[in-house]
C-alpha cells in the first residue's frame, strides 16, 4: 500500500461515494406518518402527534461498532419476523378476543381501570358555589335586564350581578314565554330565583318551621306551573287549526317543559301536609290516556326521541303505550272524531319511526292479541314481527295457530270463495306471503280433496294456477303440478274424478303438459318397487286417465304400454265403447243426431231411464269422456244450425249425459247456444233452472251478466204477462250475485210491464174468494193424493194452486193429520217436484208437530225426501229428477239448520243400525256444512250427542264421522288403535271432522256399542251427563302418549296439534302437563324416548298453551332448574348432543306458557327459579351452539326479552326495601363510592346552574356528591360466583354488562317518558322534571370525567373494539 497516497478530499471520487451512501441511509429512514394508524396527542408538544410502539432508527456509531464486533465474535442470525411490529396492536389482539377467557380478563382490566379513574377524579373538597343575589331595580331596568337575558350574546356572569327582585312564580313563567328566552337561560334564571327563595325561607325561625315554609313554597310553585300548563294545553287544542297559534302553543309547551321545576315531594295528599297541584290528581280529566293530553305526550316523546331509542326496554314500553292509545282512539266513538285525526296521524308516524329504529320493541307477546291488529294496520312490513309474536303468544291459541299456519289461511280463503269471484281472491292468497310452492300445492289439493264436494273447485283452482303462472319461470308451475300428482298415494286422499277433471282443465288452459308427468313418473321409479304397489296403482290410474288428445302421439304409445299391466287398461277397447255409446245416444237423442228411423217416445220415463243406463259411464276413461262429450256437443251444434231446438225432455236428457261425463264447459256452452233459439216457455224456464242450479260452475266459465241478459231478452220476445218462478229465481239470484247487473235487470223488467209469478201450467190461479168456497178441500186431497192410482197426474193438476196462499194453508193442514208411510213419501216427492209445496215447509211442519224423540220414523221419511235417490223407485223422468234435485239443493243451501235438526234426530233412532244407506244420503250435505257452518254442525249434531250419556246416538255419530273421514274407528278396536288411525289420517282439509271424532272417542270411550240398546223416550233431548273419573282421564292420557311414542308417528305433519284444540279444558290441561313432565323428567334429557319425540311434544304444547291446569314451576321446580343447567352445559360442550335444538325450543315453550306464574310468584323457590331461568337463558344466548343457529337464537332472544319485560312489570321482590309512594317509588340510587343502594331523595333545586369550564373545579352544583351515583330501576339482581351483576336489556344484540363499565351516567329515569301514557299518567310532569335534573347531574359528572388520562382512552378504545 502506498502510504503517501493522498487522503480523499471533497473532490475525490471516493469521498463522493461515501457521501452518497450517507445521504441514502438517511433518506431511507425518514420519518413519515403511517397511513393506517391513528395518531395520539403528544403531551410534551402542543400540536404534535406521536404514534405508539414506533421508534425510527437514529444513526449511532458506537452502537454500530459494538454490534459489528458482537456479530464477528458470536455470529449473525436473522431476527424473528414480527408482522405487527410497526403497526397497531389491534390486529394481534383481535383474534384473541374471540376466546371467552381472554374477554373476561380484558373486561376485568377495563373495569379496574374505570374504578381507578372514578377514584382519581372524585372531587372531595366541599363546594364553594353560592347562588347570585337579587337586587331591587326599577321597572325600566328590570325590563332591560329581561331583554338582556333573552339575548344569547349577553353572558350570564354579567347578568348574575343584577338579578331583579319581584319576578317569581307565574310572573317568571309569563316573562320567559313572552320574551322568548332561550330554554337554558330560562332554567338558569328560574333556579337562581328559586335558590334565593329557599335560602330566605331557611333563615326564618326554627328548622322545623323552615321545612314547613319550604313545603308551602313548593306547593305554590307547583300550582303555578300546572296552571300555566293547563292554560297552554287548552289554548293549543282550541287553536289546532291556526298555524300561527299552534306554533305559539308549541313554543309555550317547550318552554314549560324545559323549565320543569316541579317537585317530587308535591305528589302526596293534601291531608298529609303537602298540596297537590291542580291537574296532577287522580281525576279522570288529568290522565294522559284522555285525548286532551296526547299532544303534550307526543311533544315530549319527539323532544327526547334519541335518548329513548338508546334503551330497548323503554322503547318496548313506548311501543305498547303508543299502540294502546291508537287502539283506544280507533275504538272510541266520539262525535268529533275527525278532529282527532291529526293526533292519530302523529301517533302512527311515531309507531313507524319506532319500528324503523327498534323493530324488537314490538315483540310483545303478552299484548299482541290486543294490539297486534292495530300494529299491522299501521306498519306495512309487519309480517316478521307478527310471526315473532305469534311464536310466543299463549292466549287464544287456536286462533293464533290458524293465522300462523299459511296452508290453513289459504284453505279458509278458498273455502270462502264464491263464483263469480272477484279479482281480490288472487290478491288475498298472495297477501298470505306463503312460499310459491305451498300456494300451488294447497290450491291443487283443495280442488281434489275428498272433504270438499262443490263442482266449481276445479275451475277456481285452475284459474288461480293460471294467474300464478304469469310472470314466473316457465317451468315453475308445471314442476309443482307434476310434484303434486306424484304425491297422490291413495284413492282415499282425493276425489279421483275431480283429479282427472283438474288435469284436463289445466291442459285446456295450456298450463300443464302430460308428457312432463310421464317422464317424471318413469324417473321416480315408483312403478318398479314392489312395496309401493298401492302408490303405483294410483299413479297408473292417473296415467291411464290422462287427456290423450293433449299428448303427442309418441307419448300416447308410451302411456298405453305403461298401463297395460293393469287388467282394466290391458283389455280396454276405446273404439268399441265409442260405438256402443254412439248407438245409445242416437236412441236417447234422435233429434240431435237426426235419427228419423228410430222414433222413441221420450215422454216415457221408464224407457228414458232404461236407455240411459246403456251408456257405460263406469268403463270410461277420462279421454273417452272427453271424446264422447265433444262429439255430442258437435252434433248439437250441427242440429241447431239445421234449425233444431230440443224439447224440455230432450235437453234434460242431454244435460244428464253431460253431467255424468263431467263436461261442465260443454253444458254451459250448450245453454248459451240454445237460449237465443228458444221459443218455448217451458224450455226457457228449464234452462233458467239449470243455469241457477250450476251457477257457481258456470260463473267460472262464462260471462254470466251476458247470459242473464240473453235470458231476459228472450223472455221479452215470448211476450208473457207472467214470469215463471224459475226465471224469477234466476233474476233474483243474479241481482244478488252480480250487483252491477241489478239496474239493468230492473230496467228490463220495467219495460216488460209489471211482472207476476205464474204456475208451471201457465193457468191463471183462482182468486181467494173462489178458493175459500171449497170447504171440503182436505177430503179432496185425500181422494187425489192418497186414494189415487196416479199420484203424478194428481200433483200436476194441483200445481195450478201452488201460488194460492189458501191452498198452501189447506195443504199444510192436511199434511199435519197424516201418518208416516211410504205412500205419504211418494205424495210428498211429487208435491215437491211439481212445486205444490217446498221442502222447507214440510220439514218445518214435521219438526213442529212431532216431538223430537217420538217422531216414529218421521225423520227417516224427511231424510228420504231431501237426500235419498228416488229416481228408480218412483220412475222419475229426467225433468222430474232434475226438479227434485234442484229443490233439494235450494233447501240445503238456504235452510241448513232444519236439515241438521233432521240429521240429529235420526242419530237418536235405533233404525240407524239397520239402515246404513242414510250415510251415503247425507254425505255431501254434512261435508258442505262442516266446511261452511262448523259452529252450527257442533251445536245441532255434536253437542247433543257428546254431552248426554247416550250410547245409541254416540254410535250413530261415530258411524257418520267414520263415513265422512273414511275411517273404521270404534268397531272392537282399542283406544290406542283408534287414536293412531285418526292421528295418521288427519289433514288440514278434514281437521274439523277429525277434532269431532277425537272428542267423541274421549267422551264415550267404552260406552259405544255396536249393538242397539234401549233408549230413553223422555221428551227432553238431553240426558243427565256423567263426568268421567279422574283415573279414567289419566289412563286415556297415558294411552295417548304411548301412541305418540310409536316410531311410525315421527313424520306427522306440523299441524297435527290442532287435533286436540277442541277437547275439554280439563283434559287439555292434563295432556299439556303430561307433555311438560315427560320432557323435563326424561332420562335422556333433552331427548325423550329412543326416537326423540320432542318435536311432537313441542307441537302438542304449542297447541294447548292456553289450557294450563298444573303449574310446573311449583311441581317441577328442580326439574326445570336442573334441565336448564343441563341445556347450558350441553350448549358449550363439544360435540353437541343430538336433539339439543329441539330441547331448547321445548324449554322455551314451557317458560312462555308459565310466564305469569314464573315472573309474578312470591314463593321463595319460584323466585330462585326465576333468577336462574333469566340467567340461564342469557348463558344460552352466549353459547356457541346457539350462535350458529340463527332461527333458534332469534326465538331465544325474543323469549328472553319477553320474560324480562314481564319481570319489569311485576311487583317488587319481597327482599327489597319499600320506597316512598309516588313516581320514584321504583327507583334506587346506586353509589359507586361505597357500592350500596339508597332511596332517591333529589330535591327541586339541588342543581342550580350548568357547570362552567372556566370556573374553578369546586364551583359546581350544590350537593355534588349525590351525583357520584347512578339511578337504577328496581329489578332483581342475578348472582353468579359471588359477584353481583345486573342484566341490562338489549335488542337482538342484547349484552350483559357489570356495574361501572359505562363511563357515562345515562339515567333510567327516561322510563317516565313512555309511562306518560301508562298507569302513572297522573304524575307524568314529575317524571319529566326529575329526568331534567338527573341529566344535568350526568353532564357535570361527564365534565369531571374528561380528566381521564391517555391510558384510560386506550382502554376505552379496546372496550369499543371488544
UniProtKB/Swiss-Prot annotation:
Cellular component per GO, a single term: mediator complex
A GO MF label: transcription coregulator activity
SMART domains: Med12 (SM01281)
One protein family per Pfam: Med12
Keywords: Activator, Nucleus, Repressor, Transcription, Transcription regulation
Subcellular location(s) per record: Nucleus
Chain positions covered by the region annotation Disordered: 31-51
Main location: nucleus
Biological process, per Gene Ontology: regulation of transcription by RNA polymerase II
Function: Component of the SRB8-11 complex. The SRB8-11 complex is a regulatory module of the Mediator complex which is itself involved in regulation of basal and activated RNA polymerase II-dependent transcription. The SRB8-11 complex may be involved in the transcriptional repression of a subset of genes regulated by Mediator. It may inhibit the association of the Mediator complex with RNA polymerase II to form the holoenzyme complex.
Subunit structure: Component of the SRB8-11 complex, which itself associates with the Mediator complex.
Record family assignment: Belongs to the Mediator complex subunit 12 family.
Protein name, per record: Mediator of RNA polymerase II transcription subunit 12
Primary gene name: SRB8
Amino acid at each position: 500500500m502506498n502510504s503517501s497516497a493522498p487522503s480523499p478530499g471533497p473532490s475525490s471520487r471516493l469521498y463522493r461515494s461515501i457521501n452518497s451512501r450517507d445521504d441514502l441511509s438517511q433518506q431511507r429512514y425518514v420519518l413519515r406518518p403511517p397511513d393506517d394508524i391513528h395518531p395520539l396527542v403528544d403531551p410534551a408538544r402542543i400540536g404534535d402527534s406521536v404514534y405508539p410502539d414506533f421508534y425510527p432508527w437514529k444513526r449511532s456509531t458506537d452502537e454500530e461498532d459494538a454490534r459489528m464486533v458482537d456479530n464477528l465474535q458470536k455470529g449473525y442470525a436473522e431476527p424473528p419476523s414480527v408482522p405487527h411490529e410497526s403497526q397497531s396492536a389491534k390486529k394481534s389482539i383481535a383474534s384473541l378476543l374471540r376466546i371467552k377467557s381472554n374477554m373476561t380478563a380484558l373486561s376485568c382490566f377495563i373495569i379496574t381501570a374505570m374504578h381507578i379513574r372514578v377514584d382519581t377524579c372524585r372531587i372531595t373538597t366541599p363546594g364553594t358555589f353560592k347562588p347570585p343575589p337579587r337586587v331591587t331595580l326599577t321597572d325600566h331596568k328590570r325590563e332591560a335586564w329581561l331583554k338582556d337575558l333573552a339575548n344569547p350574546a349577553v353572558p350570564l356572569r354579567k347578568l348574575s350581578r343584577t338579578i331583579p327582585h319581584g319576578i317569581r312564580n307565574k310572573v317568571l313563567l309569563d316573562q320567559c314565554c313572552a320574551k322568548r328566552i332561550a330554554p337554558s337561560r330560562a332554567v338558569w334564571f328560574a333556579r337562581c330565583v328559586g335558590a334565593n327563595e329557599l335560602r330566605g325561607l331557611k333563615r326564618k325561625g326554627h328548622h322545623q318551621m323552615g321545612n314547613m315554609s319550604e313545603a308551602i313554597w313548593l306547593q305554590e310553585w307547583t300550582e303555578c306551573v300546572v296552571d300555566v300548563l293547563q292554560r297552554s294545553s287548552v289554548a293549543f287544542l282550541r287553536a289546532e287549526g291556526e298555524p300561527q297559534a299552534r306554533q305559539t302553543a308549541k313554543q309555550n309547551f317547550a318552554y314549560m317543559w324545559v323549565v320543569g321545576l316541579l317537585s317530587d315531594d308535591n305528589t302526596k295528599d293534601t291531608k298529609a301536609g303537602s298540596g297537590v297541584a291542580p291537574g296532577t290528581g287522580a281525576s279522570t280529566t288529568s290522565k294522559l290516556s284522555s285525548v286532551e293530553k296526547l299532544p303534550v305526550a307526543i311533544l315530549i316523546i319527539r323532544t327526547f326521541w334519541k335518548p329513548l331509542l338508546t334503551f330497548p326496554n323503554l322503547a318496548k314500553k313506548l311501543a305498547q303505550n303508543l299502540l294502546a292509545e291508537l287502539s283506544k282512539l280507533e275504538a272510541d266513538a266520539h262525535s268529533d272524531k275527525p278532529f282527532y285525526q291529526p293526533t292519530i296521524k302523529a301517533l302512527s308516524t311515531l309507531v313507524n319511526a319506532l319500528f324503523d329504529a327498534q323493530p324488537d320493541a314490538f315483540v310483545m307477546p303478552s299484548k299482541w292479541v290486543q294490539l297486534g291488529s292495530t300494529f299491522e294496520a299501521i306498519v306495512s312490513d309487519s309480517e316478521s314481527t307478527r310471526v315473532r309474536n305469534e311464536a310466543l303468544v299463549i292466549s287464544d291459541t287456536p286462533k293464533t295457530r290458524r293465522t300462523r299456519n299459511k296452508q290453513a289461511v289459504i284453505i279458509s280463503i278458498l273455502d270462502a270463495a264464491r263464483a263469480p269471484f272477484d279479482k281480490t281472491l288472487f290478491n288475498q292468497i298472495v297477501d298470505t306471503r306463503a312460499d310459491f310452492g305451498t300456494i300451488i300445492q294447497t290450491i291443487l289439493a283443495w280442488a281434489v280433496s275428498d272433504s270438499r264436494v262443490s263442482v266449481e273447485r276445479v275451475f277456481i283452482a285452475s284459474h288461480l294456477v293460471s294467474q300464478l303462472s304469469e310472470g314466473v319461470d316457465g317451468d315453475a308451475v308445471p314442476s309443482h303440478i307434476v310434484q303434486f300428482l306424484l304425491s297422490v298415494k291413495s284413492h282415499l286422499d282425493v276425489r279421483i274424478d275431480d283429479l282427472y277433471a283438474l288435469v284436463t282443465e289445466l291442459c285446456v288452459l295450456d298450463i300443464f303438459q302430460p308428457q312432463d308427468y310421464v317422464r317424471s313418473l318413469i324417473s321416480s321409479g315408483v312403478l318398479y318397487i314392489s312395496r309401493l304397489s298401492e302408490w303405483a296403482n294410483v299413479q297408473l290410474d292417473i296415467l291411464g286417465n290422462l287427456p290423450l288428445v293433449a299428448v303427442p302421439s309418441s307419448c300416447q304409445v308410451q302411456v298405453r304400454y305403461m298401463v297395460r299391466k293393469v287388467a282394466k287398461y290391458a283389455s280396454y277397447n276405446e273404439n268399441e265403447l265409442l260405438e256402443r255409446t254412439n248407438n245409445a245416444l242416437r236412441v236417447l237423442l234422435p233429434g240431435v243426431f237426426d235419427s228419423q228411423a228410430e222414433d222413441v217416445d221420450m215422454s216415457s220415463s221408464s224407457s228414458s231411464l232404461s236407455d240411459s243406463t246403456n251408456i257405460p259411464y263406469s268403463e270410461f276413461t277420462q279421454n273417452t269422456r272427453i271424446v264422447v262429450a265433444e262429439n255430442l256437443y258437435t252434433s248439437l251444434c250441427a242440429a241447431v244450425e239445421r234449425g233444431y231446438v230440443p224439447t224440455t225432455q230432450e235437453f234434460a236428457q242431454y244435460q244428464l249425459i253431460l253431467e255424468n261425463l263431467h263436461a261442465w264447459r260443454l253444458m254451459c256452452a250448450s245453454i248459451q247456444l240454445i237460449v237465443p233459439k228458444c221459443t218455448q216457455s217451458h224450455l226457457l224456464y228449464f234452462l233458467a233452472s239449470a243455469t241457477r242450479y250450476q251457477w257457481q260452475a258456470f260463473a267460472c266459465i262464462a260471462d254470466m251478466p251476458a247470459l242473464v241478459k240473453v235470458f231476459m231478452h228472450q223472455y221479452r220476445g215470448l211476450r208473457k204477462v207472467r214470469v215463471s218462478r224459475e226465471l224469477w229465481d234466476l233474476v233474483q239470484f243474479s241481482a244478488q250475485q252480480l250487483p252491477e247487473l241489478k239496474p239493468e235487470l230492473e230496467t228490463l223488467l220495467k219495460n216488460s210491464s209489471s211482472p207476476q209469478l205464474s204456475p208451471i201450467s201457465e193457468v191463471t190461479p183462482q182468486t181467494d174468494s173462489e178458493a175459500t168456497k171449497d170447504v171440503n178441500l182436505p177430503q179432496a186431497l185425500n181422494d187425489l193424493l192418497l186414494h189415487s192410482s196416479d199420484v203424478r197426474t194428481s200433483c200436476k193438476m194441483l200445481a195450478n194452486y201452488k201460488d194460492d196462499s189458501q191452498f198452501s194453508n189447506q195443504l199444510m193442514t192436511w199434511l199435519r193429520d197424516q201418518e208416516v208411510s211410504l205412500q205419504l213419501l211418494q205424495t210428498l216427492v211429487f208435491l215437491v217436484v211439481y212445486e205444490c209445496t217446498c221442502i222447507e215447509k214440510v220439514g218445518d211442519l214435521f219438526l213442529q208437530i212431532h216431538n223430537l224423540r217420538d217422531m216414529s220414523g218421521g225423520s227417516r221419511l224427511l231424510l228420504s225426501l231431501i237426500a235419498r235417490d228416488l229416481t228408480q223407485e218412483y220412475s222419475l223422468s229426467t225433468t222430474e229428477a232434475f226438479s227434485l234435485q234442484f229443490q233439494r239443493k235450494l233447501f240445503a243451501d238456504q235452510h241448513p239448520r232444519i236439515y241438521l235438526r233432521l240429521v240429529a234426530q235420526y242419530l237418536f233412532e235405533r233404525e240407524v243400525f239397520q239402515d246404513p244407506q242414510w250415510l251415503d244420503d247425507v254425505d255431501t250435505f254434512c261435508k258442505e256444512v262442516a266446511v261452511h257452518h262448523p259452529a252450527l254442525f257442533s251445536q245441532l249434531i255434536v253437542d247433543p250427542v257428546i254431552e248426554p250419556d247416550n250410547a245409541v246416538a254416540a254410535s250413530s255419530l261415530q258411524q257418520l264421522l267414520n263415513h265422512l273421514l273414511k275411517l273404521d274407528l270404534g268397531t272392537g278396536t282399542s283406544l290406542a288403535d283408534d287414536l293412531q288411525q285418526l292421528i295418521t289420517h288427519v289433514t288440514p282439509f278434514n281437521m274439523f271432522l277429525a277434532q269431532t271424532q277425537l272428542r267423541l272417542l274421549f267422551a264415550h270411550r267404552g260406552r259405544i256399542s255396536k249393538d242397539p240398546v234401549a233408549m230413553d223416550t223422555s221428551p227432553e233431548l238431553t240426558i243427565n251427563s256423567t263426568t268421567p273419573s279422574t283415573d279414567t282421564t289419566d289412563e286415556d292420557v297415558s294411552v295417548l302418549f304411548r301412541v305418540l311414542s310409536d316410531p311410525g308417528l315421527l313424520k306427522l305433519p306440523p299441524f297435527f296439534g290442532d287435533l286436540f284444540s277442541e277437547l275439554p279444558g280439563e283434559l287439555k290441561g292434563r295432556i299439556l302437563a303430561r307433555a311438560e313432565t315427560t320432557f323435563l323428567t326424561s332420562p335422556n334429557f333433552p331427548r325423550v324416548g329412543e326416537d326423540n319425540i320432542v318435536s311432537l311434544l313441542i307441537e302438542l304444547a304449542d297447541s294447548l298453551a292456553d289450557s294450563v291446569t298444573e303449574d310446573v314451576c311449583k311441581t317441577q321446580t328442580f326439574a326445570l332448574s336442573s334441565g336448564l343447567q343441563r341445556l347450558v352445559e350441553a350448549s358449550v360442550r363439544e360435540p353437541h348432543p343430538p336433539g339439543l335444538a329441539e330441547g331448547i325450543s321445548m324449554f322455551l315453550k314451557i317458560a312462555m306458557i308459565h310466564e305469569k306464574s314464573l315472573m309474578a310468584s312470591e314463593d321463595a323457590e319460584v323466585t330462585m327459579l326465576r333468577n336462574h331461568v333469566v340467567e340461564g337463558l342469557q348463558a344460552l344466548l352466549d353459547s356457541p351452539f346457539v350462535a350458529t343457529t340463527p332461527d333458534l337464537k332469534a326465538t331465544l332472544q325474543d323469549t328472553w326479552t319477553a320474560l324480562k319485560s314481564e319481570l319489569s312489570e311485576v311487583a317488587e321482590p319481597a327482599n327489597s326495601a319499600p320506597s316512598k309512594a309516588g313516581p320514584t317509588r321504583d327507583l334506587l340510587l346506586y353509589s359507586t363510592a361505597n357500592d350500596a343502594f339508597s332511596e332517591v331523595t333529589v330535591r327541586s333545586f339541588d342543581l342550580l346552574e350548568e357547570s362552567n369550564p372556566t370556573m374553578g373545579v369546586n364551583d359546581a352544583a350544590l350537593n355534588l356528591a349525590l351525583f357520584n351515583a347512578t339511578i337504577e330501576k328496581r329489578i332483581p339482581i342475578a348472582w353468579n360466583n359471588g359477584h353481583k351483576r345486573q342484566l341490562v336489556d338489549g335488542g337482538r344484540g342484547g349484552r350483559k354488562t357489570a356495574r361501572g363499565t359505562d363511563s357515562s351516567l345515562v339515567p333510567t329515569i327516561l322510563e317516565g317518558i313512555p309511562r306518560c301514557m301508562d298507569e302513572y299518567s297522573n304524575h307524568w310532569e314529575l317524571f319529566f322534571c326529575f329526568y331534567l335534573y338527573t341529566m344535568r347531574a350526568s353532564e357535570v359528572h361527564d365534565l369531571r370525567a374528561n380528566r381521564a388520562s391517555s391510558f384510560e382512552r386506550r382502554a376505552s378504545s379496546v372496550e369499543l373494539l371488544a
